[in-house]
Curated annotation (Swiss-Prot):
This is Phosphoenolpyruvate carboxykinase [GTP], mitochondrial. Monomer. HAMAP family: PEPCK_GTP. The gene is PCK2. One of its GO terms (molecular function) is phosphoenolpyruvate carboxykinase activity. The modification Phosphothreonine is found at T42, T196. One of its GO terms (cellular component) is mitochondrial matrix. It is an enzyme of class 4 (lyase). Mn(2+) binds at K262, H282, C306, D329. It catalyses: oxaloacetate + GTP = phosphoenolpyruvate + GDP + CO2. Widely expressed. Its EC number is 4.1.1.32. Mitochondrial phosphoenolpyruvate carboxykinase that catalyzes the conversion of oxaloacetate (OAA) to phosphoenolpyruvate (PEP), the rate-limiting step in the metabolic pathway that produces glucose from lactate and other precursors derived from the citric acid cycle. Can play an active role in glyceroneogenesis and gluconeogenesis.
Amino acid sequence: MAALYRPGLRLNWHGLSPLGWPSCRSIQTLRVLSGDLGQLPTGIRDFVEHSARLCQPEGIHICDGTEAENTATLTLLEQQGLIRKLPKYNNCWLARTDPKDVARVESKTVIVTPSQRDTVPLPPGGARGQLGNWMSPADFQRAVDERFPGCMQGRTMYVLPFSMGPVGSPLSRIGVQLTDSAYVVASMRIMTRLGTPVLQALGDGDFVKCLHSVGQPLTGQGEPVSQWPCNPEKTLIGHVPDQREIISFGSGYGGNSLLGKKCFALRIASRLARDEGWLAEHMLILGITSPAGKKRYVAAAFPSACGKTNLAMMRPALPGWKVECVGDDIAWMRFDSEGRLRAINPENGFFGVAPGTSATTNPNAMATIQSNTIFTNVAETSDGGVYWEGIDQPLPPGVTVTSWLGKPWKPGDKEPCAHPNSRFCAPARQCPIMDPAWEAPEGVPIDAIIFGGRRPKGVPLVYEAFNWRHGVFVGSAMRSESTAAAEHKGKIIMHDPFAMRPFFGYNFGHYLEHWLSMEGRKGAQLPRIFHVNWFRRDEAGHFLWPGFGENARVLDWICRRLEGEDSARETPIGLVPKEGALDLSGLRAIDTTQLFSLPKDFWEQEVRDIRSYLTEQVNQDLPKEVLAELEALERRVHKM
């Protein structure tokens, strides 16, 4: 059968005979259900025709992105039993997936390059690497050959031209996704700019090729159409950065099937960024305006479950301060002609974790998801609404709950009503505090970059890096508390450098070199780098810092540091606020001594753990500048 990818060859989309494709099925026998293949740019038409020969769909639908098309897509999904209307809200829908298809599958997510070391550093002694999964071109070819021939039989192949970033922005990039999932079509219309305007902007330009199949062909054997289509045993998400291709099979869940998100916007884009001299990062972007009217833009990288969306949509507790959201998950950043680092949010929507979202933790998110939203794997209330752990809303009398598994549920039940990774997919424009410049084609100027993690002990509320090189080291050493899969293991501290550990598109050592190289750019105005930790606890296990809207007090100090205020003192790990420099007015008593303490025994162990991780996981690819920063920290901690 014809294969999408051939090892060692750039795929020839402009005529298949040189690669010796067997004839599968003439494209003329396929029904084009919507759109005109002949009007597509040559590169896209070749991509569609070859993929159709390979996957053998029943018909082809070229998406135009219109409201009428979206309505028809949602109606089709409802008729197939894949989504349910939520009458409590305006144009909101609920999808329930197969319980085996609920999250990103890191173990089945691979980067394909000729050399393993292009993708991942090689730990000493053949130890298992934790910084990505490499697959050889030959193995990947076999995997594609086993999965894709005929995989769309009985289904429609949708052609989705989409722009990551505002259409026409010099910072944006275009992709074309082929998929047999109408759920993906409806979700991608929210998460990206999708349709005819993208084709017009692309012309004959380059685009990232994205092929996705749920991996469950309908061969006329009486398969139930209401069952969530997926193929968990054969799930594979492959990235071929040299060819700018993404190939995903077997999963309908967001991170595996909405290929514009982590696959394109981080894994492929981080490689594009390295090749072209920019940055593609797992970061929120927010604008913050002081009471005096001074506005700054900040990018921040946090691992999962550390409040990235909450910070991006924060309602500041400090009077007179205003936060506006540019993006909550991904930042593409490039230096302009004047040396300013400018950032866009390449996404068009929010794909947020539902549990824990409430009017208390994130009122702006709750306002965003009242209309035009697709919910996945949350619970449903009998009055046509949604429900999840931490929604902080009492159930009205007589209202019952159906869990994400379709079973009756009541408060106090042992099992959660919503899956822990359940999601809302909502248009960004509906957020009440979207920044006026969130779609500015030139991007917004970044003044500070913040790293952070969930650290119950030892790490202070906020500190500033000494300089850019030290800041890159701080990002490389990021760690965060995570709940282990096995319950009895309790909480463990995981390394998550730059909050990018699952998303690197190339060797992390080379990624560090790329970040370090920014310092050598002529005229570059480098942002200051900070580290925050909202999650430190006292001996009794209580949080030392109230978090949420009170985090504006930390942003206030960061902004004053950017203005050159002398409000920091030097410590072995970085610059922390001087006594009284944080505005704590109106707060209950905060134990700042404990909040900013640096226990020597903790930091001695911390630097041992960081050294072990970097020397083992990055090994020979660890830049000498990062190793020098580690050694300098070791010396400073030794003198504490």
